[in-house]
């Protein structure tokens, strides 16, 4: 047996039964594609002895089209997708079904974006394609996901009907469980060679040509559609036979419809997907209580066989609940319910049933909403009611339409040998550690191990909760652990926020990672936690994992330490056995990164065993603090009730009435979150400061702020809040203040690294230095609160805007959930400092939409006048077109308001009317609009003009997204929008990979970089988006890098915004996926520009009107070879260690390519210069 997750299990079968695989990343299906690509890169073979060809496409539409072409020419082909990706495939799925083309698409089912995007699991995507004509087979767990991947492949070849094999996103795709793997011989024996040969014989071939894809007319189209009926009528039998053949080969028997429960059941639940295992557990328990209940598992959903459904349903049943994991607003009911109801009604009408059971329908589990035993008990209880609800929801509290069922207490006995919860911080290694623990237990013991991981959409820095179960029996529990034998808190700050000890079983183990020793930690715990630990009679332990990790050179990665502590305390494996297994796992995971890293992790294991301390339980200390409120009392009511509950992990309990129905949320809620995740924060040493504001500009989270204020504003300042006389001539007589937001800083250290001011006696000391947050937080909180209330600078009064002055303007993008050290967010922050009070932002899906609009807290905020960026996200693929709609509307509204001005011209002073129709700065225009409103306030007929007069204030339209959007999936729209003459500004945050989905290659990925979907190094040069858009001639194009030239960045943004047409800014954005310490990113950015890797330029068509060449090249010719600089990044180093000979050639190719690109730019700029690297 093997321990594996659902995606891995499916990918293994799909890879071995395919010849061509077209891929594109989308959560939660991406890892299937990643593994297929990696296996192909390593030369692994399919069951026929060939290595499948794996190709990444620009979108899911491209992937399915490639599959279509491969199938039409005789290949066995597949792809993997989810959610919006599946929807992009719909037109081609219709074609595949209409052409009776055998093929399997593997889908990790996920929520489709509606009022909000959600990466989590339900059936809304697969239900949106049920009309395409594809057969649909649903797996309920990891074992089924693997097995059905093969059964669907057999059935599609037998039936010629394309199959969608789906399973629940995250709950199955990412659940780790112990399964029986399929051997190559078994797969090969089961694959129907006769049908494979027939598929190949139908291939398009000029040796025996045919025509497909014709355009039909009314005389024959209808008949042709009906001609496929026999093939669909035969699908059920093909699937059943494939399942029987599979059983004969493996011993695992499945049926398209399968009943589980009492043979004379009176109450039955019908559903499909991962919730089946939970229902089976409840059925088992209720059977022991003498109740006649059961569950009917739907596996083959399309074609839907009413005959076989009714054969599987006990004739004794008197009430049925059909559960759908989707919502179809406006429909009579959800899809599975309607199918079941139709089957029963037709059977009754045809005389095949004498009576009809009562059938009720419910929705559950949307967006991975928890569906546990209590939900199943509630449904069975409703089936017993005299008048059950015909339509209901379960798992939420609906106080608006009152559809929800009350949830009883979960009374199921627990048979697990061990249940454990691990609370970690995204990027601290907790999830990876738990995955290793599960695999160690599963692979080295006869026990079954299950792992599931709960996290939000933050890339890093968010809460992660890992669930681990160990049992002597196969684990069916597809729900979260509510009471655990072991709870590990990997971050001290969580003690104040989350109810963790409350989830401990009586006598359970509570392990806390803390800098405080066993002697001092008790008084540091909130009184509530002390009381719970006493109540549970917990065994309480502490370890200073962060200290051990630092001592072993592992930075913030505490996973190795916490893994060893878990095994040491639970003794689920004997101590020496656990140590040996962990050492082996470390060697396997890190050997490619060098033996030194392996040995440092081994050292951490040894120290961890020695460092765990037990803390005796003590009475509640009356001098200890209470758990602080989740948000400040000063927060708005909505934040205190709704946002606070979500921040505390209690959002599941919020009623329907508490939430906005249309997805509209308040701004600026990150200011109330106060994550406190930094171990160290920057402290200002003012006597060394040059007031350059580089630290403020570099800060990814707007957690360092600078202000220039009148001296009197500092008269009542806290003693620890320092200020300096302003050095700049244009601000003489004022005070300069620099201050950190101590609870919002992520501790990335970037500010310290970019600070140019050093102590002459000790260059290690700078004008800002990292110091312990715990030692400084209380004092700095007081300072920051005072700082925020200091007067703001008036942007319009600044003599010039450069990097120094721009950073005195309060940002309207703050404390986002981006990764620590993120290279994207400083650009967005700068935009809001320059134009935030009049910005409209269309944001493509990706990292920037997640840290920009991920609940429960959002970073875009408003100024003192209530103005700020108005932000919206549509989709990944359509952002350019979406933003164009903003521009067209703004222009149209302005035209209408100007028309209304003319209509009331006789009531407006001539001077004001002329001014309103002339150019003006936004500040002046707002004064004019205020004057207009005052002038027409008593004119009742002018209400429309007064209401909409703000349209006269010019809006700054920005279309923001990453390189995956701009270079790949959204390129067609971006290209079209730029081909127009509309005044839109496009900012591409170029990380050179799909950062949000885990670092897959895009067309922006450079030569030689190793990424997911490019495990053996990019073999071709990156697409030059900037140069290609220059070819239009009328587009402003700039390539910038904040770390390379701060002021060039500011200048390019200002020019782009002022340009009266389309503009494109491509901003180099360091990312964690690049594989180096992002604290050093600005230095790396400078070096990359020096090598020619990222030249800086501004292409301004207006320069041609002045008799100049449009292109201004702002960086010098390459002055050094790129190899040394690129090898600072793991994405380039990996190729050196994997394939040194290939890497050596690619470095030469890269140097030549960079030089050629620079020479082309220099020629365009009239600066034909020779490289300094020759």
UniProtKB/Swiss-Prot annotation:
Please list the residues that bind [4Fe-4S] cluster 1.
689, 692, 695, 755
tRNA-binding is among the record's keywords:
no
Q: Which UniProt keywords apply?
A: 4Fe-4S, Electron transport, Iron, Iron-sulfur, Metal-binding, Oxidoreductase, Repeat, Transport
| Molecular function, one GO term | pyruvate-flavodoxin oxidoreductase activity
Q: Does the record carry Ribosomal protein as a key word? A: no
Reactions that this protein is recorded to catalyse: oxidized [flavodoxin] + pyruvate + CoA + 2 H(+) = reduced [flavodoxin] + acetyl-CoA + CO2
Signal peptide as annotated in the record = none
Q: Where does [4Fe-4S] cluster 3 bind?
A: 819, 822, 847, 1071
Q: Which cofactor(s) does the record list?
A: [4Fe-4S] cluster
Any idea of its EC number?
A: 1.2.7.-
Its recorded name reads Probable pyruvate-flavodoxin oxidoreductase
